[in-house]
Amino acid sequence: MRKLLWLFGFLPLFLQAQVEQARVHVEKLCSPAFHGRGYVNNGDAIAADYIAEQFKAVGCSSFSSGFFQSFEFPVVAFPGKMEVSINGKKLVPGTEFVVDPGSKGGEIANLKVAVVTLEEAFDPKKLKNKIAQVNMDGGGRSKQQLALLFSTWQVKGDSLKQLKKMLRELVTTFPVIEVVNDKFTWSVDQEQTNNPFIQVQYTAIELGESNFITYSIESVVKQHRARNVLAFVPAKKRSKKYLVFTAHYDHLGRMGQEAYFPGGNDNASGVAMLIELARFYKENPTDVNVAFIAFAGEEVGLLGSKYFTENPIFPLENIQFLFNTDIMGSGEDGVTIVNATLFPKQFELLQQINTANKYVVKVGSRGPAANSDHYFFTEKGVPAFFMYTMGPNRHYHDVGDTYENLSFAEFNDLFGLLTKFGAQVSEKAYKRGKKK
């Protein structure tokens, strides 16, 4: 206990260095040289190497298999041309248009566009007539080439869901243009659509009586080899038990060579937290092993963590607690804890620590959800929390999620909350597990 008191008396001095070093990590991981940590230009591989280098520099130990765990999966990538013009105006990728994460590529000039009204969209007969009308040449013959444009931003609720579903069906036959009036939220997909599917900002285009689209889009489906990055700090005395911290490092990558998604808050910030936690525990080992796992493939569907739980490097039953972190670059409005309702005692401990130290304004409770890498561990019986911050930064899965847009306002407090929780939850579990 005396050592714990000394340790956390030292913590405030340690924290300032932590946040400054975290800024360095995030700026690096968000830089164009990392290509959005995705599937173009080996972005995720560059990030994996960087994280492993940081674990080594900190002095962490590797597992018997090394610092990496490899696995494969199919993914849609956009490595080359990404050009779209509507009525002669060239649109800016990432801000004025995005392609659907599973969009097929293609190249065509001056393809006629049928602008579908909402009335036509929700009436199959009128929609069919509209397509037939626009799809005729001057001699009354069908041209068999046409793109469909829908403005979905005027629709809400169930009607919007119905319309979105319709677009998914129509893209099997036609290129589809969806006009939106809110920020883009991009993603990653593993399967291609039959035709190009393009989202365009309402403010970026002007429509007339006759409308045309020109596009050149390179889209490929490839089998991708990714790597989880793993390290640990051994316990002070030999132990089979683990406290585990995790964060995914992959993001969305590039959409062509001009636009990339930096992924500052999601989740370069979580990776920075992971690296700095490794530094802290290397200098302050505990009675249990402390493992650090940076997962790949989270944005594709939690693939890295799923693979790890099916092929564990150490027995999952030896994990006393797992803490998954994401969106660590803000926190002005507090944090939310997924799985809080599954593990009420641990959640109560976390709240007590936060209240006693006045770390963040709120520690919110949320039930189980398959929304990050904690999920498959929980499914295997591992006690786990997933913590993400809340704050004014609304950039998520867009090109504005940059290093410059992060406040790091609560990074120090989040670090303190995590380390104090880690010390107490592992100490209590260790004492319960000791033989008398």
Language model features with spans:
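Second-shell loop/turn segments in exported
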Residues: 32-42, 57, 69-72, 113-116, ...
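Extracytoplasmic/secreted proteins, especially bacterial periplasmic and envelope-associated proteins
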Residues: 21-24, 28, 42, 46-57, ...
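Soluble metallo-hydrolase cores and metallopeptidase-like ectodomains found primarily
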Residues: 105-113, 118-124, 180-262, 279, ...
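Metal-dependent peptidase/peptidase-like ectodomains
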Residues: 286, 295-395
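N-terminal capping segment at the start of a domain
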Residues: 19-42, 46, 58, 62-63, ...
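His/Asp/Glu-rich mid-to-C-terminal helical/loop segments that flank catalytic regions of hydrolases
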Residues: 279, 394-436
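Bacterial Sec-dependent N-terminal signal peptides
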Residues: 1-21, 25
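Noncatalytic luminal/extracellular "stalk/propeptide" segments of secretory-pathway proteins
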Residues: 35-146
